[in-house]
Regions:
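ATP-binding glycine-rich loop module of kinase domains
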Residues: 2-47
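Active-site beta-strand termini and strand-to-loop segments that position acidic
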Residues: 15-18, 79-80, 131
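C-lobe/activation-segment region of protein kinase-like
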Residues: 141-223
Length: 223
């Protein structure tokens, strides 16, 4: 196993699985939790994440294929997607490429939300532009855009939760891509609105504004 990333909740390994390049995601023990509680939580989250990845694929969102789930060892074996994280690509693109990519991201989020799936951790680190060998017919022959890391995802019919998803992405853009954040977010919303419908999108965006107002108020109220 080759460790490629250590995370707060899980470690990622690159591994050959039955002749295929695969990612193994292994949830790590939290020593501050009681052992029996920790086991239950890790088992549940392992199975839940695999289920949510499957549900996202059913919704038409490209995600890694899940090959195997081992709840007793808290691992998911899934497809390795050769490519680059959008975080590493976004600012090196020309304006048209960046606008197009942002529009596509909005469309993917809309597909999730139409199926009542909330990602819970929308950042440019959790989007992978696959290498050109993986073509997306819907995007004019461009590489496929994959959404990963469904560890915090859940089902919800609430507008508020959709607003939180978009707010998290907006915050991630401002944090990691300040120079192009406004432009990118605008085109994310364009793609989202086109895919989910203008009327519904405006309700979700109203929630985003509410969330931002609450955040500003909380900051002002802090002594």
């Amino acid at each position: 196993l080759k460790l490629i990333r250590k995370g707060a909740e899980a470690d990622l390994y690159l591994h050959e699985w039955h002749g295929l390049q695969a990612i193994i995601k292994r949830r790590v023990r939290k020593k501050y939790r009681h052992r029996s509680l920790d086991l239950r939580i890790r088992r549940y989250r392992t199975v839940h994440e695999a289920q949510m990845i499957h549900e996202a694929r059913k919704a038409g969102v490209p995600t890694p294929i899940v090959y195997e789930v081992d709840k007793d060892h808290f691992t998911i074996v899934m497809e390795y997607i050769p490519g680059m994280r959008v975080k590493e690509l976004l600012e090196s693109m020309d304006g048209e490429e960046r606008r197009n990519l942002s529009h596509r991201i909005g469309g993917l989020i809309a597909r999730l939300h139409k199926r009542n799936i909330i990602h819970g951790d929308l950042t440019t680190s959790n989007l992978i532009m696959a290498e050109p060998t993986r073509r997306n017919p819907e995007a004019g022959g461009e590489g496929m855009l994959f959404l990963i890391d469904f560890g915090l995802s859940y089902f919800s019919m609430e507008l508020e939760d959709r607003g939180v998803d978009l707010h998290l992405l907006k915050r991630a853009l401002n944090s990691s891509h300040f120079r192009v954040a406004g432009e990118c977010y605008s085109h994310v919303i364009s793609g989202y609105s086109e895919a989910i419908g203008e009327e519904y999108a405006s309700k979700v965006l109203g929630k985003v504004e509410e969330i931002e107002r609450r955040g500003r108020y909380a900051l002002r109220s802090t002594p």
